[in-house]
Amino acid sequence: MPQPLKQSLDQSRWLKEAEIKLRELENLVDSNLEDERLKPQLSMGEDVLSPEAGDPLHPNVRAPLSHVIGETRHDPPHLGNRDPARHKLGKLTGLYQMKGCEFNPHWKIPDISATNFSQEIINECPSRNWKYLTPAKFWPKSISYLPVHSGVKPKYPEFQQNHESLVNDYLNKLFEAGILYKRVSKHLVTFKGPYFTWEQKHLVPQQHGAYSSKINDRQESRRRRIITATSSRKNDSSRIFGAHNNGRKISYHSTRDGSHRLSGRTSDPTSRGALAGGDSTPIGPGSTAAHPSTHHVDRRRRQKGQGVLQAISREPSETRRNGTTSHHRVARCRTSSVEDFTRRPFTQSKGAYPRQGTRGTDPQGPKAHQQEENGSYLRGNTSWPNRVTGRIFLVDKNSRNTEEARLVVDFSQFSKGKNAMRFPKYWCPNLTTLRRILPVGMPRISLDLSQAFYHLPLAPASSSRLAVSDGKQVYYFRKAPMGVGLSPFLLHLFTTAIGAEIASRFNVWTFSYMDDFLLCHPSARHLNTISHAVCTFLQEFGIRINFDKMTPSPVTTIRFLGYEISKQHMKIEESRWNELRTVIKKIKVGQWYDWKCIQRFIGHLNFVLPFTKGNIEMLKPMYDACTHRVNFAFSSRYKILLYKLTMGVCKLTLDPKVSLPLPRVATDATLTHGAISHITGGSAVFTFSKVRDIHIQELLMVCLAKLMIKPRCILTDSTYVCHRKFSKLPWHFAMYAKQLLTRLTLYYVPSKYNPADGPTRHKPPDWTAVTYTPLSKHIYIPHRLCGL
């Protein structure tokens, strides 16, 4: 193509070339291929089959990309109907006919360690995020409950019993790790591990853990309290438990063999009331109120007596084994006193609740350790339904590990259907932002959180909404599950707060995304040192690091978020390119593919598209198939175009230099005419072949200026052109225009300041008062990531 002189845009030879190019663009716009062939067809016809289906692929791929794009005009892809179609495209399968999960009776339950972060991290890592995390709250609009026996999905009908048994083992492991609550009654649950501060006020004293179920036992009268001696039977010792009769004090003694007996020793109210060894004490908290003038027991002795009462109540089984009437009534009375005690809000004194795993001195001996193993009891401010809200099943850990099982929880009722919730959005960097924030030329280390979601505690009332079951026992998630749309948002808040503290405390560039951390520093030695310090810092607060997935030492090339990041560039691994090329080669031209299968194919193409010379408009036919939910058929030329995209692999530069060149070319258009003006004073006016929408006429002139002058930037008064949203245009023209303007800077200029506005009105161009601005959207980068 001859290059025109910028001072003489009105040369006849250049004008003839420009007229030819303009007519080609207009023909591309006016072609109705998209309006006719890309509409959903009612039936599959023979014309869908491409005549070049058997042609070799590679010779055509060697052609330039612009030539391949033009060839698709004569052989476009097609949309079909909703009849059953192929669900397999290479290794990709449609979601309707995914490969069935195979049950493995020898599945191993993975090791699930207790994950409990210390609340001291709130003071060490100050952030506003903690108020959303301590505890996290989940309030669905409405809930659909299912019966307990349907808690396990019948994924493997032939192995349902074995499946439920493995699910039971898995849930028990989660319960032992403190991740689940286990239902005891309508108002009572139990859990393992240390408690949180918001759980403390709802705790039932562990001293009465064996009788905790009696709190809600309606068979026992709630009005029963400590029975006083008002009966007429004076000699019945079972009726005067806990009462003082004429100075006699009824004491309860524990014998060596574990049985109990009553003693009726007469004691002076001012004398020592504790028995030998402190194993027995005067019982009767109501007796002091009955005789206030005769019993002035000091506070210390009363506290000691209550402690012995609690020690006695830990052994209900021995009491019930005794067959005497008096002992039976004592046990019933003691149960009622426990019930009365647990109705009051529980506040724990220092050292009264040893946390699980601590090895402090226990004054109560092995009994306290036994209660610790049994877990803590929680009487929440909500009811715990004997129903489930999510169904569960087991699958393979991943495609590479089929020996271990993974628990899948289906809480989809909260994300779709009538109970669908709108979960909060959070900042997620796209590829352009990631290129801007990653520092250049620094060694890097990546860290990975282990069991990341299980670091996030839930409020007890929210836990009651997340109920699962193995078919027999009901469990509630005490920590955030992975099957709820709120969990990624909570994890983002959690890692963001930690990442900000790591960056300020250790003077290192830190970026966190979900459960991944990326640390960068100019000095490899310093980075290696602080990586160990960071791991120690996190582990001190109970945050677990997956050392198998972290980088042991600083490296220059690292894999992060699916990208391969070096000192200066980022690219996609070659293995992913090979897999995608293999999928494209296995496309059968002219055959119908289900839109769900096409949807998965689009996802893979979108991930690699920024690293190619293509654009998003090339995938528009497949997007149309997914939008209309109809089948899709590839043509031979379209298959070649997709394969051509995978051949032009490129790598992206980190921290690219943003240049804003001075504009030297301006374009303008009316419904009938278009003009191109150069800063040197030359201009050219063109007449359109027909009247079209003004935004299409403006785009035609910008494309013509790019083809004929090839400037670095162009002035235009069309916001439609500046935003480059061409999805509503005919497909071939949109794909060609997007490809043509990919690396071109477009400036918006008001119409009255547009130099090309004059030639369209038969006036000379005016470059003296040009006011322009780029309309590109500014990239949002958090303040703490803008330092480097």
UniProtKB/Swiss-Prot annotation:
Keywords: DNA replication, DNA-binding, DNA-directed DNA polymerase, Endonuclease, Hydrolase, Magnesium, Metal-binding, Multifunctional enzyme, Nuclease, Nucleotidyltransferase, RNA-directed DNA polymerase, Transferase. Residues 334-350 have a biased composition (Polar residues). Residues 293-304 have a biased composition (Basic residues). GO terms for biological process: DNA replication. It catalyses: DNA(n) + a 2'-deoxyribonucleoside 5'-triphosphate = DNA(n+1) + diphosphate; Endonucleolytic cleavage to 5'-phosphomonoester. Multifunctional enzyme that converts the viral RNA genome into dsDNA in viral cytoplasmic capsids. This enzyme displays a DNA polymerase activity that can copy either DNA or RNA templates, and a ribonuclease H (RNase H) activity that cleaves the RNA strand of RNA-DNA heteroduplexes in a partially processive 3'- to 5'-endonucleasic mode. Neo-synthesized pregenomic RNA (pgRNA) are encapsidated together with the P protein, and reverse-transcribed inside the nucleocapsid. This is Protein P. It comes from Heron hepatitis B virus. The lineage of its organism: Viruses, Riboviria, Pararnavirae, Artverviricota, Revtraviricetes. The gene is P.
